[in-house]
């Protein structure tokens, strides 16, 4: 049985805040394909603003992938297992030097980064 849904640490925080009535905006780079667009639609349907979201082209991110993770739910004494597949995703391959971070963050009171996701980006030193 296979079930697909969207999530991830930073997206989950934005969703939780939006559900509490806090104005939340999510920034990332996703491929400009049905998977990337679906992820953006799902966030927007849950009241998360995605205006600064970058839909990358194959020229900008040659692998043109959405980072994924797979959860195999445990049963009984067998624990659940998570497999991450983020390498060469649109986010990690996009040239973040193209992003005006000052303009992107203008007007926001809080910035939430978590986990290792920003470190996967090839242009992470910009962050």
Task: State where each predicted segment sits.
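Alpha-helix C-terminal capping segments
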Residues: 12-23, 45
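Short pre-catalytic strand/loop immediately N-terminal to key active-site residues, enriched for Gly-Thr
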Residues: 1-7
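Residue-level marker of alpha-helix boundaries and capping positions
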Residues: 4, 29-30, 121, 125
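Conserved beta-alpha-beta core of the PfkB/ribokinase-like small-molecule kinase fold
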Residues: 110-127
């Amino acid at each position: 049985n296979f079930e697909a849904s969207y999530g991830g640490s930073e997206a989950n925080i934005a969703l939780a805040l939006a559900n509490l009535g806090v104005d939340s905006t999510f920034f990332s780079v996703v491929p400009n394909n049905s998977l990337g667009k679906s992820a953006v639609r799902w966030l927007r349907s849950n009241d998360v603003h995605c205006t600064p979201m970058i839909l990358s082209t194959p020229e900008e991110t040659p692998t043109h992938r959405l980072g994924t993770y797979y959860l195999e739910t445990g049963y009984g004494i067998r624990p659940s297992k998570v497999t991450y597949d983020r390498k060469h995703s649109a986010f990690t391959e996009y040239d973040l030097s193209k992003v005006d971070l000052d303009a992107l963050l203008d007007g926001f009171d809080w910035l939430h980064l978590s986990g290792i996701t920003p470190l996967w980006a090839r242009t992470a030193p910009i962050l």
